[in-house]
Amino acid sequence: TLATHQIVGLSEAAKLMSSCQSVELQRLQALKSLFLDNVSKLPGFFQNSHPENHFPGILNFGFSGVDGETLLLAASRIAVSTGSACNSEKIEASHVLRGLGLTEDHAASSIRTSFGRYTTAEDVRSASEEICTIINRLIAE
């Protein structure tokens, strides 16, 4: 038996998405740009996400010489990960990043974060400030 109510719900969700998708993608791009404006100035910054061909709500980046797991553990006020949710139990570097040709060290230095429907510019400012504080502290150690 087909779940008619779920089919109708999916149809309505698709209609809503198509009506606001362009505006939402622009909003996410603006949030990502705000984040990058702050963190890209830090020493050793690199971005794994393609600069143009990507979903603007997900950003994969890191800092050369800074272990992603160390950054993850230090970032107590923000949500970042060293890989996808389905691989969150694994300690090793992301197999996806390795598959893209990144070295083991580069992949191990990478973290990912995302911007969602309810993420505000203030959330992004706060998150980027925390990343800046952590990286500056780790570099000084």
Question: Can you say where each PLM-predicted feature lies in the sequence?
Answer:
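Localized chelating/binding microdomains
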Residues: 13-16, 37-38, 45, 71, ...
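Conserved C-terminal alpha-helix-loop-beta "cap" of PLP-dependent enzymes
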Residues: 59-111
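A generic structural micro-feature
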Residues: 4, 53, 105-107
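PLP-dependent enzyme catalytic core of the Aspartate aminotransferase-like
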Residues: 93-141
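Amphipathic alpha-helix from the class-I
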Residues: 1, 5-23, 37-43, 118-121
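Glycine-rich beta-alpha junction loops
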Residues: 14, 35, 63-65, 86, ...
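Conserved PLP-dependent catalytic core of the aminotransferase class-I/II
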Residues: 18-71
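Predominant activation on well-ordered alpha-helical scaffold segments within soluble catalytic domains
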Residues: 5-15, 36, 72, 94-97, ...
